[in-house]
Structures are given as C-alpha cells and as structure tokens.
C-alpha cells in the first residue's frame, strides 16, 4: 500500500500540513532491515534537501527517471528497477521498516539504478524534484480512505495532479493503480478534469495492467478471490 502525506491546500495551491493521507505506523525494524539501513543507506539512500537534486549527479548518468510514491516494502519497485537497468528509479516511503526491507531487497538483487527517500512524499516532490525532470510517476495502491467522511484524505486531488504534472516531462506518464473501484472512479474523475493530461486508455477510462508493473502477492491473491484492480495512465501533454 502506498502511504503519503497531506491532501489539503491553501488558495495559492500550496500544500498545508493539516490532513494526512497516511496513518503513521512506524513499527520496529527487523534485524535484517536495521542492518540494511546501516549498510545500504549510504549507498542508495537520499537525504531530504529543500532544493532540487541533480539527477545526473545522483545516478552518475543521464537516463529517464521513474519515481514511485509509497513503495510499501519495496519488492515490486526493486523488481522493476532490476528489469529495466536502462532507467533510473526513485522510491519514497515514510515507513522505516518498508525502507529497510526495500534496501535489503535491492542489495540482494544487486540493483544500482535505485535511490530511496525515507521522507514525506509531498515535501520531496515539491522541493527536491525539478520541474519537467521525470519520465514517469507511479502511485500504486494508495490508502483508499473508503469512508465518505475520509475522502478528503485521499492523496489524488486536483492540486496533487497538478503537482505531478509539473514534475513530468512532456510525454511523461502518471501511472495509478488501486484495488478499490470507488477510488478508481475518483481517480478517473480527478485526472480527466486535470489540465495538461491525456488519458492513455483508448476507451477513456482504465488500462490493462502493463507488463512492467509486477503483480504483487496481495494482488494475485485478490485475483484468485475475484477482486478487481484498476490501472490508470495519464500522459503529460
């Protein structure tokens, strides 16, 4: 599940820190996760800075960059990085055990094209990522906040869509996925109304899961139980 920060804005479109779109459940690190934090963070961890990072300097090369918001335990993100060594990947996660698990997984997989933030995703996007610098932004299985009174906590709102658009290159893609049909309808409504995007679905709604997005264990179990998953892909134009 993706867990990210606030979804409330002031009149100028600036994010406010009032409504969180995640529940902070820190949890204790396992021995392996703690070891990965100690050994791997200096190699692929990114410390938050309030100014844009230089992607060429960070990765030591020029390449298209994919950013994932809320990577959970990181298994699918590491799998994607390993499967596409020609791309740069950045993952953002607020929960430390997930970061530790991702670092351990990355070390085991031997990936060198992945960097990780343990920080608030909105702050990273607003301040650390240059405009027009990303080839793709991924938001997979964000908290659906399924109760109506909690819908304001959903991360996918109009100002958030604009923030993502500003960070994408022209032709870059915002890829969303959810296993809550109501949230997929909300996502579609927000993204269809958002200026500067084109839906990549030929039917104007959802797309089939692309081959590059790994099928998670949770998702595979859902399929066996007859649960749906909805992917949406919107291109910056």
Swiss-Prot record:
Positions bound to S-adenosyl-L-methionine: 68, 93, 120, 143
EC id: 2.1.1.33
Gene Ontology MF term list: tRNA (guanine(46)-N7)-methyltransferase activity
Binding site for substrate: 147, 179, 216-219
InterPro entries xref list: SAM-dependent_MTases_sf (IPR029063), tRNA_(Gua-N-7)_MeTrfase_Trmb (IPR003358), tRNA_methyltr_TrmB_bact (IPR055361)
Function recorded in the entry: Catalyzes the formation of N(7)-methylguanine at position 46 (m7G46) in tRNA.
Origin species: Shewanella pealeana (strain ATCC 700345 / ANG-SQ1)
Presence of keyword Ubl conjugation: no
Family that this chain belongs to: Belongs to the class I-like SAM-binding methyltransferase superfamily. TrmB family.
Catalytic activity entry: guanosine(46) in tRNA + S-adenosyl-L-methionine = N(7)-methylguanosine(46) in tRNA + S-adenosyl-L-homocysteine
Active site (UniProt): 143
Top-level taxon of the source organism: Bacteria
UniProt keyword list: Methyltransferase, S-adenosyl-L-methionine, Transferase, tRNA processing
One matching Pfam family: Methyltransf_4
Pathway the protein takes part in: tRNA modification; N(7)-methylguanine-tRNA biosynthesis
Protein name per its UniProtKB record: tRNA (guanine-N(7)-)-methyltransferase
């Amino acid at each position: 599940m993706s867990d990210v920060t606030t979804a409330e804005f002031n009149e100028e479109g600036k994010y406010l820190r009032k409504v969180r779109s995640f529940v902070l459940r820190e949890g204790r690190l396992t021995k392996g996760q703690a070891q990965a934090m100690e050994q791997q963070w200096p190699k692929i961890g990114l410390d938050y800075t309030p100014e844009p990072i230089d992607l060429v300097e960070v990765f030591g090369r020029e390449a298209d960059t994919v950013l994932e918001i809320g990577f959970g335990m990181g298994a699918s993100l590491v799998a994607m990085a390993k499967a596409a060594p020609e791309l740069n990947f950045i993952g953002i996660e607020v929960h430390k055990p997930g970061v530790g698990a991702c670092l351990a997984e990355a070390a085991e997989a031997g990936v060198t094209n992945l960097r990780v933030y343990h920080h608030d995703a909105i702050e990273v996007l607003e301040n650390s990522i240059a405009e027009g610098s990303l080839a793709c932004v991924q938001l997979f299985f964000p908290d659906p906040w399924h109760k109506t009174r909690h819908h304001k906590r959903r991360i996918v709102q109009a100002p958030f869509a604009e923030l993502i658009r500003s960070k994408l290159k022209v032709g870059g893609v915002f890829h969303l996925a959810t296993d809550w049909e109501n949230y997929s309808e909300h996502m579609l409504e927000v993204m269809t109304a958002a200026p500067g995007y084109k839906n990549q679905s030929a039917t104007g709604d959802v797309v089939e899961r692309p081959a590059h997005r790994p099928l998670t264990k949770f998702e595979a179990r859902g399929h066996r139980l007859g649960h749906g998953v909805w992917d949406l892909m919107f291109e910056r134009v």
